[in-house]
UniProtKB/Swiss-Prot annotation:
The gene is trmB. Keywords: Methyltransferase, S-adenosyl-L-methionine, Transferase, tRNA processing. This is tRNA (guanine-N(7)-)-methyltransferase. Its EC number is 2.1.1.33. Catalyzes the formation of N(7)-methylguanine at position 46 (m7G46) in tRNA. GO terms for molecular function: tRNA (guanine(46)-N7)-methyltransferase activity. GO terms for cellular component: tRNA methyltransferase complex. Belongs to the class I-like SAM-binding methyltransferase superfamily. TrmB family. It comes from Paramagnetospirillum magneticum (strain ATCC 700264 / AMB-1). The active site is at D143.
Length: 238
């Protein structure tokens, strides 16, 4: 197990972040959402040694808490929140344009009761979460960092899987998707090798994917022209 798994309550050192935090200039409405709605939904960066109880981030009782790493435009997370009002959804994203997009969905669909946003690197939040506190984690179409010299920037890694294994409940799900063949092979190798995870599904057949797995905008646009591969792994019983 990695050091984060062994010491889940250790203070998270701020990791180096690679990627954009802002794209095109935000329009007035989007800026208004960032200024007015985001503060009401934000999960603060934990203090050293702070524990963050995910279920207590929501105003009402939730049956489970699910977390999405890098939610992009927020379509997937918003659909899950709408379909599962008794589930708390935490979306982690640093890209302000994507955050504004999710906030638009939250406002239009009135999802403020079961959506929370961590607008920072998810690696700052995960160490503060208690063992077995999440029911599902989603890592959908992360930056593949296809060059070999950038392999250490890929989110799926033995160390990250240690952390996810710690915070997922027994039987909890890790859902991963990518359309980059290098990342697909990388993710499959590390997921298959990790003793805490059991493979349930690995397919490029969208019809074989569970019905409660909404498509992301990236997937719908099919930017690369390559068929995505979908992985579903289950956290083995402790």
């Amino acid at each position: 197990m990695g050091k984060h798994a062994e010491n889940g309550n250790a203070a998270a050192e701020r990791p180096r972040f690679f990627g954009r935090r802002q794209g095109k200039a935000l329009r007035r409405n989007a800026l208004g959402l960032i200024e007015d709605l985001l503060p009401r939904l934000t999960v603060a960066v934990p203090e050293p040694d702070e524990r963050v109880e995910p279920a207590l981030l929501f105003p009402g009782a939730v049956r489970s808490v699910w977390l999405e790493v890098g939610f992009g435009g927020g379509e997937h997370l918003a659909q899950l929140a709408e379909d599962n009002p008794d589930i708390g959804l935490i979306g982690c994203e640093v890209f302000r344009n994507g955050i504004a997009s999710l906030l638009g969905h939250v406002q239009a669909r009135q999802l403020g009761n079961n959506v929370r946003v961590f607008p920072e690197d998810v690696r700052l939040l995960l160490p503060a979460l208690p063992d077995g506190s999440l029911g599902r984690v989603f890592v959908l179409f992360p930056d593949p960092w296809p060059k070999t010299r950038h392999a250490d920037r890929r989110f799926i890694s033995p160390e990250t899987l240690d952390v996810l294994a710690r915070v997922l409940e027994s039987g909890g799900e890790l859902r991963v998707a990518s359309d980059d063949p290098i990342y697909v092979a990388w993710a499959a190798r590390h997921l298959d090798a990790h003793p805490a995870f059991e493979k349930i599904l690995a397919t490029a057949d969208r019809s074989a994917v569970p019905a409660d797995w909404p498509a992301t905008r990236y997937e719908q646009k099919c930017i690369t022209g390559r068929a995505p591969v979908f992985f579903l792994y289950r956290r083995r019983a402790r």
